[in-house]
UniProtKB/Swiss-Prot annotation:
Similarity-based family: Belongs to the DapB family.
Source organism per UniProt: Xanthomonas euvesicatoria pv. vesicatoria (strain 85-10) (Xanthomonas campestris pv. vesicatoria)
GO biological processes: diaminopimelate biosynthetic process; lysine biosynthetic process via diaminopimelate
Protein name per Swiss-Prot or TrEMBL: 4-hydroxy-tetrahydrodipicolinate reductase
Keywords: Amino-acid biosynthesis, Cytoplasm, Diaminopimelate biosynthesis, Lysine biosynthesis, NAD, NADP, Oxidoreductase
Entry-linked Pfam families: DapB_C (PF05173), DapB_N (PF01113)
Xref: SUPFAM superfamilies: Glyceraldehyde-3-phosphate dehydrogenase-like, C-terminal domain (SSF55347), NAD(P)-binding Rossmann-fold domains (SSF51735)
Recorded catalytic activity of this chain's protein: (S)-2,3,4,5-tetrahydrodipicolinate + NAD(+) + H2O = (2S,4S)-4-hydroxy-2,3,4,5-tetrahydrodipicolinate + NADH + H(+); (S)-2,3,4,5-tetrahydrodipicolinate + NADP(+) + H2O = (2S,4S)-4-hydroxy-2,3,4,5-tetrahydrodipicolinate + NADPH + H(+)
Length: 238
């Protein structure tokens, strides 16, 4: 690890994404995880050199350069407030946020650099660009977004499906959504444009959850030093 390693606080460290972030960050010499926040009091206070904290102890988290949040909606407000209070950027992939929480995000973007995204993969960033272009180029065509995820995913449609829908709506389409929860599907999104006698399908399939964690870690590095504002993944990586 270099002396100039980016100090990262991981919020939601006990979840699928949190565990992937911890594992991949440990392999990256440019990153130092200075704290991991979990929902309840941790059974071990230090794991592989990383201090663990309960969500109720968030205010006592050590100094960090950027926070990465993959938690639940009910845990989102405290990490957003902490970053705003300390003037540190935030990368968040927590989905299922309500309108009040989205408004809080917009307000916080006046103080800090932040990126909220339902999906941090480079492929989905490209897919979003393609959906935006297709919707604007194919006026009047039906637009349907089909998404499939593992049985444990609670929100539907997925945050990524809604993001793709926003891209389509912004270019004039009126998307409809279909959701499937089955097995251990990591994530599949199909955006279908249907006209008279022809159909266009844009598809992204994730086969490994690590792509999301890698993307979030990469976004965290790129967010360092950015002026206050709300950034999209594609603003940072494309």
């Amino acid at each position: 690890m270099t002396t100039s390693a980016v100090k990262v606080l991981i919020h939601g460290a006990s979840g699928r994404m949190g565990k992937a972030l911890l594992r991949l960050a440990a392999e990256d010499q440019t990153l130092q995880v200075v704290g991991a926040v979990v929902g309840r009091s941790p059974s071990q206070r230090v794991v592989d050199g990383v201090p663990f904290f309960a969500a109720s102890e968030l205010g006592g988290a050590p100094a960090f350069d950027v926070a990465i949040d993959f938690s639940l909606p009910q845990g989102f407000a405290p990490i957003l407030a902490l970053c705003a209070q300390r003037g540190k950027p935030l990368v968040s992939g927590t989905t299922g946020l309500d309108e009040a929480q989205r408004a809080a995000l917009r307000d916080a973007a006046q103080q800090i650099a932040l990126v909220w995204a339902s999906n941090f993969s480079l492929g989905v960033a490209v897919l979003t660009e393609l959906v935006e272009r297709a919707a604007g180029t194919l006026p009047g065509w039906d637009c349907d977004i089909l998404e499939a995820h593992h049985v444990h995913k609670q929100d539907a449609p997925s945050g990524t499906a809604l993001t793709l829908g926003e891209a389509a709506t912004g270019s004039g389409a009126q998307p409809r959504y279909v959701s499937l929860r089955a097995g251990d599907i990591v994530g599949e999104h199909t955006v279908q444009f249907t006209g008279l006698g022809e159909r266009v399908e844009l598809v992204h399939r994730a086969t490994n959850r690590d792509i999301f964690a890698r993307g979030a870690l990469h976004a965290a590095k790129l967010l360092i030093g950015k002026p206050a504002g709300s950034y999209r993944v594609r603003d940072l990586v494309l």
